[in-house]
Amino acid sequence: MKAVILISGNGSNLQSIIDNADRIDLQISCVISNNKNAFGLKRAESAKLQTAIIDPELYNSKEAFDRELISIIQQHGVELIVLAGYMRVLTPLFVSHYFGKILNIHPSLLPKFPGLNTHQRAIDASETAHGVSVHFVT
């Protein structure tokens, strides 16, 4: 299966995907980041993967940004888009365009602890169980 991975930061989930891509029959066509300083871009480059950076500050709206993101993704003819630490909320335009093809990795057992700092919030709440959610974006 051909996929594009979207990242914003360290890329630890990206690295796990890279390390297991052959095992799960996944071809990573491109890694796209909205953050030019994302360490995940270095991980992608080390794995000899194509990368792209889209700076949100260059666009006057979230929809304009997502239109550019769609344009780049369309060049790769992918079947799957993986949000691996991607820290932007996708617009309805993007979600409807790729409905059923967007997989999100979230570091908590949703619906508990959406958003940032999930691990610390779980510790602060004295949770006895904590994990990860992987779900299709709707």
What kind of feature is each model-predicted range?
Residues 52-57, 105:
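Short beta->alpha connector loops at strand-helix junctions that form conserved
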Residues 47-48, 98:
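Short, structured coil segments at secondary-structure junctions
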Residues 29, 79, 100:
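Conserved acidic residues
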Residues 1-39:
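N-terminal Rossmann-like dinucleotide-binding module
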Residues 20, 26, 84-138:
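Donor/substrate-binding cores of folate-linked one-carbon enzymes
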Residues 64-72:
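Charged helix-capping and loop-helix junction motifs
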Residues 33-34, 58, 62, 76-92:
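N-terminal glycine-rich "phosphate-gripper" loop used for MgATP/nucleotide binding
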